[in-house]
Amino acid sequence: MQKKDMEIEITLLTVTAVSLFTIKLTRKAYRFALSARIGMSAMLVLTAIGHFMFTKGMAMMMPAFIPFKTELVYFTGFVEIAAAIGLQLPKLRVLTGWLLILFFILILPVNIYAAIHHVDMATATFNGDGLDYLWYRVPLQLVFIAWIYFSAIKARDPEAFDIENNPPYAYRKNI
């Protein structure tokens, strides 16, 4: 298991938990889906940063027939940042959720290719974990897909950040 994956899991879970309790304190209610989307957005920003820090290693994760590998790594980094923002915008949340699920499905073959070829994206070498890594990565990818589905698509709080129509609890008394 690569260290970067533990960092993204820790970020996802920690930011989700902190958001959950912060929202509970400010809105007097738990907003699980909103907290999960905030956690996923933080994770996406972290992984996007990885696209700019580990560009060479990420380019090595793609098969030879894919052109413009470096540009594609940068592009997908920007896509992840856009998705992080889209998850927080009520009007774009569901569309962003579906596009993220598609994105997570499309990048899985890249992770499989990288595992087959022992790519270590952080060091840009062929000293990675190999096929054993897939026993971790494939279920993790399924967790990400479920996380997005339940927090962005199936969630019932589309106006969670709409301050005008859904103000925090402390301000409702004055309206």
Residue map of PLM features:
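Membrane-interface extramembranous regions
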Residues: 1-175
